[in-house]
Amino acid sequence: MDYNKLRNIGISAHIDSGKTTLTERILFYCNKIHAIHEVKGKDGVGATMDSMELERERGITIASAATHVEWKDFPINIIDTPGHVDFTIEVERSLRVLDGAILVLDSVAGVQSQSITVDRQLKRYSVPRLAFVNKCDKTGANPYNVRDQLRSKLDLNSVLMQIPIGLEDKHIGVIDLVLMKAYYFEGKDGTEIIEKEIPSDLLGEAKKKREIMLDALADFNDELMELHMEGKDVPIEIICNAIRTGTLALKLCPVFMGSAYKNKGVQLLLDAVTRFLPSPHDIKNTALDINNNEKEIDLKIDNDLPTVALAFKLEDGQYGQLTYVRIYQGTLRKGQELINSRTSKKFKVGRLIRMHANNTEDIEFGGSGDIVALFGIECASGDTFCDPSINYSMTSMFIPDPVISLSVKPKDKKSADNMAKALGRFTKEDPTFKTYVDIESNETIIQGMGELHLEVYIERMKREFKAEVETGMPQVAYRETITGKAEFNYTHKKQSGGAGQFGRVAGFMEPLNKEGETYEFVNLIKGGVIPTEYIPSCDKGFQKAMEKGTLIGFPIVDIKITINDGQYHIVDSSDIAFQLAAIGAFREAYEKAKPTILEPIMKVTLEGPTEFQGNMFGLLNQRRGIITGSLEDGSFSKVEAEVPLSEMFGFSTVLRSSTQGKAEFSMEFLKYGKVPNAIFDELRKKFNDQNKS
């Protein structure tokens, strides 16, 4: 394989923008599948990339399956990413290992809420992208409008590389502004590409749009700028070099168009992927040297250097755990010995495979920059595998905290065993899915990023693991905090024969207003009134006290604790005595520091026909929502709001019924906010009643 020609790309989009259909067409044109299937299982088969039964049924892509294809002797690894906000970790994971991306947009809806989330993630990982305006055959299609939205909403320097030949039901092809040729897609499944001269009625428009394109590209190539200013013809090679330079520098987003469903424009998009998106050689990747104070190391695409690979996705295959890996340096070979830098455990590479959706191909070797999969390796998602001569870790992926929890109860003993297996598997493969046993109720609690996220795991428990479970009502992850300052001076004393316990801790607590931090401990002890070895014990005790607040039993956050005095006993003082003194001191001051309850506030985006805009406003207002913005774009309306998570349960059903199923919403965690007094009283009462019973 020529690794200079390798492309690792992702296809990212808002849900229902036609992303899986586009991937399906790419597989078809690259001869990986022999028939085209539609997504929602209309023909009883379902799209090839949506290989989980559940995905085929819902018509949404959940797991990012990796597929290897070849287009005109360019090897391409495609990671199919989910478009639903509840599966954000899948998207984050995929982007971590990509070199380039295709952002798919609906020609009518344009830039939607999830497109904005996906774009933000692409920017976080500095992923160069092309835009593909899909569904140009739809009523109301307007690729020019979408190009403008890419500028106004995503702040991308979006430049048209093509213009459509006809729109809506008259969409028959595209004009390539670089080559100045018209392309039509004919024959069964659009496999015959017909190149013709540009139709005379579109020539003027094409010339005008080409001028705009060349003006934009002049920023990326001096030779192009000079030729263009002098009114001379610019060679195609120079134009292509300028497009590639701008795209790789993240300063240009080339815009292509067509209709994946109607088989228009997909092959030209593949040409653009090979021409304008980066190879692994074009991207800088770094790792941290664990043996050298986590010093940053530049990794090189070189098969002769020690191996560094990242496990970015786990799946249950028919032969055991399947681990998807991206090789950043060196090679992976069958029988090779590697070390997991997180666990320091050595292991041997067994079966090495290349994936095609859910079919596998055994291979002997994977080179630098490639994406392959391993069977039977014990690891967690995000682990780094290295040659034993080095100890590197790829920087960890950004992992958001879960915002919703649910109790799950197995119906019988067999289901209990299967549920335990399922939970072990899910927590390994998804760092945003967490589980624990509530000590008081003895219930198993699962936590995740949203209702759909947890629903999918409940379904998977039933289908894949045959675990019949009952679920409780979704619970919100509340927090407690303080709004005032309070002093403490607490003595912990226990003398009942034998070794006693003694420790006194004094100081004060106050709100901590620091972005991204929830606790700070300041030691102002002088003169050894608390010996140095017991200071960490105090710190530990305060943190223990914060695990469960006294208002409603949720963790306490945003507190700064300062200790400035204390006392110890030469015999009775100990680590545990000062931990208990700190816990007592915390509780004493907490009641006086005006404690309050915080709730997760979500950023909610509603999109739907303008005729339902009033209904959308109404639904948000009923849920204590604060409208932060609204946009009317002809027949299409978008409303943004900040809404407490506790008000959003079951919202999708209510939204569907009040908009005839025509509106959709997405939400993501924004911040924690103080609950209103009425809700504060309600939560306190509920907590106290539970404790009494």
Swiss-Prot record:
Residues 4-281 form the tr-type G domain. GTP binds at residues 13-20, 80-84, 134-137. Keywords: Cytoplasm, Elongation factor, GTP-binding, Nucleotide-binding, Protein biosynthesis. Pfam families: EFG_C, EFG_III, EFG_IV, GTP_EFTU, GTP_EFTU_D2. It is found in: Cytoplasm. The keyword tRNA processing does not apply. Its main location: cytoplasm. One of its GO terms (molecular function) is GTP binding. One of its GO terms (cellular component) is cytoplasm. Catalyzes the GTP-dependent ribosomal translocation step during translation elongation. During this step, the ribosome changes from the pre-translocational (PRE) to the post-translocational (POST) state as the newly formed A-site-bound peptidyl-tRNA and P-site-bound deacylated tRNA move to the P and E sites, respectively. Catalyzes the coordinated movement of the two tRNA molecules, the mRNA and conformational changes in the ribosome. Belongs to the TRAFAC class translation factor GTPase superfamily. Classic translation factor GTPase family. EF-G/EF-2 subfamily. HAMAP family: EF_G_EF_2_B. This is Elongation factor G 1. It comes from Borrelia garinii subsp. bavariensis (strain ATCC BAA-2496 / DSM 23469 / PBi) (Borreliella bavariensis). The gene is fusA1.
